[in-house]
Amino acid sequence: MVVKVKQKIPLKIKRMGINGEGIGFYQKTLVFVPGALKGEDIFCQITAVKRNFAEAKLLMVNKASKNRVKPACSVYETCGGCQIMHLAYPKQLDFKDDVIRQALKKFKPTGYEQFEIRPTLGMKKPDHYRAKLQFQLRSFGGTVKAGLFSQGSHRLVPIDNCLVQDQLTQDIINKITQLVDKYKLPIYNERKIAGIRTIMVRKAQASDQVQIIVVSSKEVRLARFIGELTKAFPQVKTVALNSNCSKSSEIYGDETEILWGQEAIHEEVLDYGFALSPRAFYQLNPQQTEVLYGEVVKALDVGSKDHIIDAYCGVGSIGFAFAGKVKSVRGMDIIPEAIEDAQKNAKSMGFDNAYYEAGKAEDIIPKWYKQGYRADAIIVDPPRTGLDDKLLKTILHYQPKQMVYVSCNTSTLARDLVQLTKIYDVHYIQSVDMFPHTARTEAVVKLQKRV
């Protein structure tokens, strides 16, 4: 390497990386610079030197891109929750198209150069879109603050006015910090592994109902806290306590108890309603979820004789879009509370052809096939880690005729397509901007078994 840590260098940014950073070359050394944009001439300082690349901190933009904008967020550079707010929104969508192309080029699934990559579907107003927050709590000089850890650290950045967060959820977390202070509730101490560590606030867009999870390493007395909070915000319908005594970075423990209110809140998507319990997964951008699920519906050509598997089904929200027009829908999820919601939702909507089971897809699907169930189509919506190897082998073994892959990580998507394109053709990839101002995107991939 020709560069050293703390060295200051000029750099021409040639392109943007998958995490939103600018990329340039200094005497043949690849340099990643967060905050820099394609086409810019910058001055930066090397912060880390690796075997094949270096990382740097942006010091000055000597020649700015015409697509650079001033972020409206006061903590944008320290928070780390958003990565590309300094890029004009239409160009953010172009960037997300390019991220998909970069991932495909890296992993090279069969026929990737001919894949149809459709332009990312963006938002008209890409602000205050997050209906869910998970903020950490810490004490600053005796005052409780809520926020996010700065990128790659355990240093909390207090946030009281997040520009991508739904305003009601932000107002509620602000009130929560005041009440935690007022009632002297214990705040998490990393050395003692004790106290309240995380607060989750989620709003259902359709009903304005709100649920809250207090994550604590020990039992806390919340009666007065709950009384004052629910009086100030009658939209709050559920307060739950999750016990997490782990030293790991996992947000939640295994046990969640409803302390006050109803078991679930009411949400709607694609003209049907469903219950959502506190631990159940649901997309955090309700407006774009309508768009995303609409694309899933378009991608599957199914009828009254077809059977569908909805892997990673959550509360059943994707599968319900098909339950009224197919022979059967079966789904599974590793979170038991989500499956309970899915079962209740199916019953309330009269879908007696929908069946849900708690467990891993790679374990349950082979069991169903041994029992004689045959799926004509499968929908997968895995976490950022992508498909489990065992599930990939299961899909390749049983070979449903159609498949829709909903991905929140283009790298693991491209990796999984290497295996899937052994028997499937990719018809197209349609990305949906679920997370404006971040480097993340969501993609719907239509696959058809090769004849």
Curated annotation (Swiss-Prot):
Annotated binding of S-adenosyl-L-methionine, by residue: Q283, Y312, D333, D381
Domain named TRAM: residues: 2-60
Catalytic-site annotation from UniProt: C408
GO biological process: rRNA base methylation
SUPFAM superfamilies referenced in this protein's UniProt entry, alphabetically: Nucleic acid-binding proteins (SSF50249), S-adenosyl-L-methionine-dependent methyltransferases (SSF53335)
Record flagged with keyword Methyltransferase: yes
UniProtKB keywords: 4Fe-4S, Iron, Iron-sulfur, Metal-binding, Methyltransferase, S-adenosyl-L-methionine, Transferase
GO molecular function, one term: metal ion binding
EC number of this enzyme: 2.1.1.-
InterPro entries according to UniProt: MeTrfase_TrmA_AS, MeTrfase_TrmA_CS, NA-bd_OB-fold, SAM-dependent_MTases_sf, TRAM_dom, U5_MeTrfase_fam
Source superkingdom: Bacteria
Positions of [4Fe-4S] cluster binding: C73, C79, C82, C162
Family statement drawn from the similarity comment of this UniProt entry: Belongs to the class I-like SAM-binding methyltransferase superfamily. RNA M5U methyltransferase family.
Name the UniProt record assigns to this protein: Uncharacterized RNA methyltransferase M6_Spy1337
Organism: Streptococcus pyogenes serotype M6 (strain ATCC BAA-946 / MGAS10394)
